[in-house]
């Protein structure tokens, strides 16, 4: 298939993919994630991803709560694979790239010893709906989402491009806000594993409301 062809279903993706464990990183289907790659093993990962033609990297969070080895922590069982859609060389040995999310996956098993970077055998079929853009977005409570976003922005003295937000489809809006949200690995993982867009939006709203309530009670300063 052409290297820029859209993936139409789980069967078009490889069963074994390289994975990049990164705490707090949330990639979602059709979302964009910038990455600054500088470690030798991950530079090799990018080279291999480009060489094999798929240009795929699986983003996944390390599960530190179940890890004894900090150098090679356990992984959460669900991640999201992205395709390298932009790549630039920094001139000092780094890659500056952008991943575009394709589909979530479940880890079947980790494949050990083949490369310096980690690889996993994965299953995309539980997330077959990820291949259908904007699926379920009509069920999202957009009004509630924008209301809590407004409260969050006021509480943290932040500004956004409201014109862009108002024109964004629900899927793009929910996923972008989830990916950019300042919450911890557990909250990010919950949003990743949400069964549908409506539930992801509800989790984001609930977490934000709890964060705002906590700040009002404790008097914490706004985000800088």
Where are these regions (language model features)?
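Positively charged
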Residues: 1-160, 186, 197-200, 206-224
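Core structural elements
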Residues: 165-183
């Amino acid at each position: 298939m052409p290297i820029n062809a859209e993936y139409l279903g789980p069967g078009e993706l490889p069963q074994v993919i390289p994975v990049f464990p990164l705490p707090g990183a949330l990639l979602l289907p059709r979302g964009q994630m910038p990455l600054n790659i500088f470690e030798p093993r991950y530079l090799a990962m990018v080279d291999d991803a480009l060489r094999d033609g798929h240009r795929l990297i699986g983003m996944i969070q390390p599960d530190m709560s179940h890890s004894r080895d900090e150098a090679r922590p356990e992984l959460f069982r669900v991640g999201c694979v992205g395709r390298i859609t932009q790549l630039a060389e920094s001139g000092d040995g780094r890659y500056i790239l952008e991943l575009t999310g394709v589909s979530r996956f479940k880890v079947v098993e980790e494949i050990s010893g083949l490369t310096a970077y980690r690889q996993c055998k994965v299953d995309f079929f539980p997330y077959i709906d990820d291949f259908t853009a904007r699926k379920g977005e009509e069920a999202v409570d957009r009004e509630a989402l924008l209301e809590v976003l407004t409260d969050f922005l006021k509480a943290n003295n932040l500004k956004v491009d409201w014109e862009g937000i108002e024109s964004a489809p629900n899927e793009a809006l929910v996923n972008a806000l989830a990916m950019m949200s300042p919450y911890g690995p557990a909250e990010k993982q919950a949003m990743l594993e949400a069964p549908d867009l409506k539930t992801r939006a509800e989790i984001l709203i609930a977490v934000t409301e709890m964060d705002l309530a906590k700040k009002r009670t404790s008097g914490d300063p706004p985000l800088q």
